[in-house]
Amino acid sequence: MTDSGPKPPTTPPEFEGFRYRSLLRNYTTLSGLALAGIALANIIVLAIIDVTSDRPNPYTGLLAYMVLPAFLAVGLILAAAGIWRERHRRLVAVSGDPMQVKIDLAHPTHQSRLIAFISIVVVFVLLSAFGSYRAYEFTDSTTFCGELCHSVMHPEAMAHDHSAHARVGCVECHVGSGASWYVKSKLSGTRQVVKTVLNTYPRPIETPVANLRPAAQTCEQCHWPRNFWGAQLKVFNHFSSDEANTPRQVRLLIKTGGGDPDNGQATAGIHWHMNIANKVEYRSDAKRQAISWVRLTDPRGNVTEYTASGGDLGANDTIAVRRMDCVDCHNRPTHKYNPPDHSVDQAMAANRISPTLPFAKQQGVQVLTAEYKTTGEALEAIATKIPAFYKTKYPEAAKDRKGDIESMVSELQRIYRENIFPEMHVDWRTHPDNVGHYYYNGCFRCHDGNHKSAEGKVITKDCNSCHTVLNQEEGVLPAIVVNVALGFKHPVELGDLTSVNCSDCHNGGVGP
């Protein structure tokens, strides 16, 4: 009897003699699958570590999202190449037609393999999307910028971690938002990577950064110039280099000023330079430390040009005319390397170095400013020279105040680690801070009394233009930190109402 029912599909004749599964059985494909499998396993493990870790390791992110995915891709390409080559060889052997490719969706085997292939592709695309996003996040992280190239960026990373902007990511200032600056930063970063690999990068890293994004697009996202006004009290503590470390305190009222006409201080204070109605331009050398020419355009459009006397206009200029913005004064808002004199003063004012140790200021500054080839050599010298000084000059102090001397050594080592980097030739002298004028020219780059206009106007050097000295005293710091304050004098005699709260009368509306 003949069965007239439907027959299950059979293997097409062109595929007789081999099965797809056997296409994996070649050295190229097996090698590619092994490489891809190992890479994928490591990616999964490292990604889990990276996601669950409180403090990601820079090398974990580098391997998980950048290095290992490249090996995974190479492995998959090798596997595909091996399958194609094996299939090509067998088709030629069976039919003589290497281009013969047929997929029969009515065939159960073809259906299952197509579904499996599509599923693998979908999973791979999803994993690739996750990995690509994590790679993007990683390359924008402070960990990537500051810790991956440890020896190169160590000074910048250390300064960032101890700055007022420690919680602000590198890209917030160096890149900002938007695709165009992101692309520019990555292109610039590629050039820097090449220099790092070839060991041709400058030591120290050159500043100011060329083509840095304008401060109006970065700094002003948080520090809006229209919301600056008034004055600030600044207290400066200094210690002399004598045996007693004689303290001296200077109190200044810094005339910060502002740029908001609504507050009635649109033309007052230091931030007059950044007033939205004023335009200050200048020419200088590449380091922006020697300014030869200044042009001021006031709110009415009047233009005044000032030229430094005693030199030709632009003789040493290497940059084009630049409009003044935040970073022309605040040029070290994050990567600041404090001078030893300032650092030791702060440590003594905070009693991290005892001010009662003889010659503590002198010895601390001397040991920090000495020349060393490596950080390790410097730390060892600090640990040796300070105890040796007191043992030789003040044997009783060396014996009775051993704890204070050890604390001094520890603090000086901390100061050195955070501010001086001999391997990269970085210290306070290589990166001047333009805020103020105590250790660097800063304000005096323009306010030196030598910049004159054709009409005879001179950029002022009057100290009181920017700050007012409230008092200067010498003595024991705890005695001079607190000054006697004057009692508030009410404009109207209150009589028996002196104990009444201000808000009982002043309600914000019509006065009493």
Language-model region placement:
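Extramembrane terminal tails and long inter-domain/linker segments of multi-pass membrane proteins
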Residues: 2-18, 92-110
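Eukaryotic non-globular interaction segments with acidic/serine-rich, low-complexity composition
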Residues: 2-21, 373-388
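Hydrophobic alpha-helical segments
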Residues: 6-89
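Polar helix-capping/helix-linker motif
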Residues: 20-29, 107-110, 141-142, 163
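Non-ligating segments of multi-cofactor redox enzymes
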Residues: 31-45, 60, 64-67, 74-78, ...
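Membrane-interface interhelical loops and short amphipathic "cap" helices
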Residues: 49-62, 143-153, 158, 162, ...
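Juxtamembrane/interface segments at transmembrane-helix termini
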Residues: 81-91, 131-140, 345
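C-type cytochrome heme-c attachment and multiheme electron-transfer modules
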Residues: 100-134, 143, 168-171, 175-337, ...
